[in-house]
Amino acid sequence: MADIYRFPKFSYEDNGTVEPLPLRTGPDKKAIPHIRIVKVGDPPKHGVRYLDLLLLGFFETPKQTTNLGSVSDLTEPTSYSICGSGSLPIGVAKYYGTDQELLKACTDLRITVRRTVRAGEMIVYMVDSIGAPLLPWSGRLRQGMIFNANKVALAPQCLPVDKDIRLRVVFVNGTSLGAITIAKIPKTLADLALPNSISVNLLVTLKTGISTEQKGVLPVLDDQGEKKLNFMVHLGLIRRKVGKIYSVEYCKSKIERMRLIFSLGLIGGISFHVQVNGTLSKTFMSQLAWKRAVCFPLMDVNPHMNMVIWAASVEITGVDAVFQPAIPRDFRYYPNVVAKNIGRIRKL
């Protein structure tokens, strides 16, 4: 069993909403490019901004032509057919220009895509034609980038391995950063196990503007019968001295003193941000890597949900602190289906 503390609405109502990407088509029946920028923290209204960018678009392959070797092959542009949709995260950089200049530079990129595999399926991106507005990101764009296929492609199985594939950028998601930085809790700290401790986890409830059932993301019904989505993130551990007895009121008082503020960003698709405005113990602060602002990209927490809702309107409708007994140290984590040294199975 777990005890729950519900955060007040003011802790997430200011920046807890993301507007949808408008899908409009032009005379050529192609989607009209659009850029969406949200603010996290208190970024400057004008001038230099720190922007985190995620490029969204369609994977395309050249269409088969029947008139091979004709003169029209040299004069007519190559036509493409869509084989999937996906994204390309290009990270944070200091940007000086306008949103429309940035959108134009992103849609002009020539992005070659290859599907491959290592320990798991991967997507390889190679980028060319980097315009001036994207020069702050050029250090990353000029190098080949490899991502987990299940995080950046909605249906990686639809990408052919024997054809040329390109990513045609249609939408740009940007997060303008202020005092809040993109600091993730390191995995070693998130997996930390301490004796005599209580795990503080956050249950985040979302309302989206699209139906997600047909895409494999089942909603849950709240008390009013509305369909909602939710996910959990780990914040840290509350530890008391040996011999001290935990109480729900003690844990709630620790959380209330933190004065947490929550917001949504567009890092990796949809991201959940936590800002600490109150007091923290040194033990808890060390678990946050000594940061007062941390980011939880949904791309890492729940990749499939992220891909289904990353272009939709998203709104935080509730955040709960869930107090659970910390997992004992002697419990073993099995990241693989094939367990080590079981029967005749041996890991190489």
UniProtKB/Swiss-Prot annotation:
Pfam families: Matrix_Paramyxo_C, Matrix_Paramyxo_N
Outcome when changing V217A: In strain: Mutant KD-52M
Top-level taxon: Viruses
Annotated GO CC locations: host cell cytoplasm; host cell plasma membrane; membrane; virion component
Lineage, top ranks: Viruses, Riboviria, Orthornavirae, Negarnaviricota, Haploviricotina
Post-translational modification: A large portion is phosphorylated in the cytoplasm, but not in virion. However, this phosphorylation is not essential for virus replication.
Organism expressing this protein natively: Sendai virus (strain Z) (SeV)
Phenotype for I182V: In strain: Mutant KD-22M
GO biological process: viral budding via host ESCRT complex
Gene: M
Family: Belongs to the morbillivirus/respirovirus/rubulavirus M protein family.
Protein's UniProt name: Matrix protein
Keyword list, A-Z: Host cell membrane, Host cytoplasm, Host membrane, Host-virus interaction, Membrane, Phosphoprotein, Viral budding, Viral budding via the host ESCRT complexes, Viral matrix protein, Viral release from host cell, Virion
Protein's UniProt keywords contain Transferase: no
Location of the protein in the cell: Virion; Host cytoplasm; Host cell membrane
